[in-house]
């Protein structure tokens, strides 16, 4: 894989992973629309490692609290904010693991990796995000995250396995419907991404490690570093903008891209 292709894929993954515009959809589209080679599983895992590092660093205080609370959780005690956060993150991740295994075992996932599917999901879930953002309340903050809300958002997150949906987009949508303000909705959605990315990496990482060579390791390291920097920049920018801007710019982008993709798919 050329350095230019590697740079492009890592940059796109880093920028789109946490913005509500679907990273998987963009990574599937790049090879199809630009005629570049598919990144392969090794690079896919590497860029996810990079984005994982970025979100952990950005939310290190929350991550540290969840780690510190895990021993208490293992003894059945959910009596600290950290233990509660760790518990709710686990609960919210269960649906996506179950649905992911179902799609993998049945082979359905491969049939969903098409321009038409991505076009429809970009368009439909972009409009749903707009609806949720306009009608959603602001009475809840991230500290109000409850078991019921974790289950609800976890079920919505599972739908994001359909390419083009956007994991962050659909969990933010769910949070806005549940009454979380914009910053809190994004914060909870980003925290939910951590165990989800880890789970995805565990499934794919073992095979990659077993078959990796020196070239793959070099490309993976470059991709991880680039996606880390891009993701960290995207997170910083998004949360700064959310202080004064709604999710409408992301919706407009999704609708325009969705329409273009549908025209390409059905032309």
Curated annotation (Swiss-Prot):
GO cellular component, as recorded: plasma membrane
EC number: 3.6.1.27
InterPro entries named in the record: UppP
Predominant subcellular localization, coarse grouping: membrane
Keywords, ordered alphabetically: Antibiotic resistance, Cell inner membrane, Cell membrane, Cell shape, Cell wall biogenesis/degradation, Hydrolase, Membrane, Peptidoglycan synthesis, Transmembrane, Transmembrane helix
Any Gene Ontology biological process: regulation of cell shape
Domain of life: Bacteria
Catalytic activity: di-trans,octa-cis-undecaprenyl diphosphate + H2O = di-trans,octa-cis-undecaprenyl phosphate + phosphate + H(+)
Keyword presence, Cell inner membrane: yes
Any Pfam family: BacA
Transmembrane segment boundaries: 1-21, 40-60, 85-105, 112-132, 189-209, 219-239, 245-265
Membrane topology reported for the UniProt record: Multi-pass membrane protein
Principal EC category: hydrolase
Family that this chain belongs to: Belongs to the UppP family.
Function (record text): Catalyzes the dephosphorylation of undecaprenyl diphosphate (UPP). Confers resistance to bacitracin.
Miscellaneous information on this protein: Bacitracin is thought to be involved in the inhibition of peptidoglycan synthesis by sequestering undecaprenyl diphosphate, thereby reducing the pool of lipid carrier available.
Name of the protein in question: Undecaprenyl-diphosphatase
Species in which this protein is naturally found: Jannaschia sp. (strain CCS1)
Gene name of the encoded protein: uppP
């Amino acid at each position: 894989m050329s350095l230019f292709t590697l740079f492009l894929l890592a940059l796109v993954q880093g920028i789109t992973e946490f913005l509500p515009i679907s990273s998987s959809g963009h990574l599937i589209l790049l090879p199809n629309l630009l005629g570049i080679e598919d990144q392969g599983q090794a690079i896919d895992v590497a860029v996810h490692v990079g984005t994982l590092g970025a979100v952990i660093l950005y939310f290190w205080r929350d991550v540290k609290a969840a780690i510190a609370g895990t021993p208490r959780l293992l003894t059945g005690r959910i009596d600290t904010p950290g233990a509660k956060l760790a518990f709710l993150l686990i609960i919210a991740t269960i649906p996506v693991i179950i649905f992911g295994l179902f799609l993998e075992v049945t082979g359905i996932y491969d049939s969903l990796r098409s321009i038409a599917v991505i076009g429809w999901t970009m368009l439909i879930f972009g409009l749903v995000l707009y609806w949720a953002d306009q009608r959603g309340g602001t009475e809840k903050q991230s500290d109000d995250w409850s078991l019921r809300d974790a289950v609800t958002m976890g079920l919505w997150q599972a739908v994001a396995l359909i390419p083009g949906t956007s994991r962050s987009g659909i969990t933010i949508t769910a949070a806005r419907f549940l009454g979380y303000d914009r910053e809190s909705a994004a914060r909870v959605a980003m925290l939910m991404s951590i165990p989800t990315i880890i789970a995805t990496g565990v499934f794919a990482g073992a095979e990659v490690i077993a078959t990796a060579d020196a070239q793959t390791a070099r490309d993976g390291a470059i991709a991880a570093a680039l996606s880390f920097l891009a993701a960290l920049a995207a997170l910083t920018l998004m949360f700064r903008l959310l202080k004064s801007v709604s999710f409408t710019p992301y919706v407009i982008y999704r609708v325009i891209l969705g329409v273009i993709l549908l025209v390409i798919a059905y032309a």
